[in-house]
From Swiss-Prot:
EC assignment: 3.6.5.3
Gene name of the record: tuf2
Organism domain of life: Bacteria
Protein's recorded name: Elongation factor Tu 2
Domain tr-type G positions: 10-204
Length: 394
């Protein structure tokens, strides 16, 4: 079969498999690839190709991840699968693979296990918006009541972490049997694909969001005023738009009087573009790196938040020793470092390199943030951890 060319016209959705070790995440990933390419065309990936996950580095952290792609009639999916539990933790916290939705794989022979719970908690903390459940290995369970019991348990567990446990789709299937080509089980994979299509809404494209540009540099151009430069994170800024400067100092309002890219004047700057924005009446010393330029009212500055953090291991170039409460590192948001203090959960005295932990961070000056924002933890310019804002406190 000829290689299909990448269809730009279909909506692109990012998904991934999560769940306990050996519950069948990689087998399911292979089964989805196999059944969908058989049904709708494309190129299938087998278990060995997916299992042999290449090493990637995201912010200095080594993560093994497999990426596969598949199509349904209406969408193009990019799917991420990780071989080890630690890879999941790192992947979700660094946002190396941002998921629009996750497929939680639970072996019906085991029911929910410790990592099932941990992956659900992580999904909640890092802002995975939708979860679909695939109960795997159902060919090995003859007792219909047992399957119902496992399904109930999984739904309750999801509800415990504020996912709509009673309403989300649960598909009972067998990834291995589907991979072996048994029609009744292949049908379950198609049912899963339909659930992905209907239950996970089309993600908002970066360009459709509220405008935000993290400021990297500030220049003053004689006779014209102050220019800030950076890469537009989302949205569009047009000449004449009112914008806010948020973070570090008091929030101020100004107007965009010009946009330029590669020394050419433009009418607008769009998500993904590096550009300079000319600000009316703003003095050079009123803006600095680390602030953001944003659509008024779309983002606010905060100093205190709950976060989920992964602490780099010694092998990854992280700390060699644990840290304790009272630890004061730098927190690197977008373009700048801000000092902050940490509060550990009750009963936790110290944090070891290689751990993941929930902590409350208090910064010495406010940063423009919303839930889901990623950051690095640094000591003297060296990254020692990665985190995500789970909940804003103040």
């Amino acid at each position: 079969m000829a290689k299909e060319k990448f269809e730009r016209s279909k909506p692109h959705v990012n998904v991934g498999t999560i769940g306990h070790v050996d519950h069948g995440k990689t087998t399911l990933t292979a089964a989805i690839s196999h059944v969908l390419t058989k049904t709708y065309g494309g190129e299938a990936k087998d278990f060995a190709q997916i299992d042999n996950a290449p090493e990637e580095r995201e912010r200095g952290i080594t993560i093994n991840t497999s990426h596969i792609e598949y199509d349904t009639p209406t969408r193009h999916y990019a799917h991420v699968d990780c071989p080890g539990h630690a890879d999941y933790v790192k992947n979700m916290i660094t946002g190396a693979a941002q998921m629009d939705g996750a497929i939680l794989v639970v072996a019906s022979t085991d029911g929910p296990m410790p990592q099932t719970r941990e992956h659900i908690l992580l999904s909640r903390q890092v802002g995975v918006p939708f979860i679909i459940v695939f109960m795997n290995k159902c060919d090995m369970v003859d007792d219909e009541e047992l399957l119902e019991l496992v399904e109930m348990e999984v739904r309750e567990l999801l509800s415990e972490y504020d996912f709509p446990g009673d309403d989300l789709p649960v598909i009972q299937g067998s990834a291995l049997k589907a991979l072996e080509g048994e029609p009744e089980w292949e049908a379950k994979i198609l049912e899963l694909a339909e659930a992905l299509d209907s239950y996970i809404p089309e993600p908002e494209r970066a360009i459709d969001g509220a405008f935000i540009l993290p400021i990297e540099d500030v220049f003053s151009i004689s006779g014209r005023g102050t220019v800030v430069t950076g890469r537009v994170e989302r949205g569009i800024v047009k000449v004449g738009d009112e914008v806010e400067i948020v973070g570090i100092k008091e929030t101020t309002k100004t107007t965009c009087t010009g946009v330029e890219m590669f020394r050419k004047l433009l009418d607008e700057g769009r998500a993904g573009e590096n550009c300079g924005v000319l600000l009316r009446g703003t003095k050079r010393d009123e803006v600095e790196r680390g602030q953001v330029l944003a659509q008024p009212g779309s983002i606010t500055p905060h100093t205190q938040f709950e976060s989920e953090v992964y602490v780099l291991s010694k092998e990854e170039g992280g700390r060699h020793t644990p840290f304790f409460k009272g630890y004061r590192p730098q927190f690197y948001f977008r373009t700048t470092d801000v000092t902050g203090t940490i509060e550990l959960p009750e009963g936790v005295e110290m944090v070891m390199p290689g751990d993941n932990i929930k902590m409350v961070v208090t910064l010495i000056c406010p940063i423009a943030m919303d839930e889901g924002l990623r950051f690095a933890i640094r000591e003297g310019g060296r990254t020692v951890g990665a985190g995500v804002v789970a909940k804003i406190i103040a």
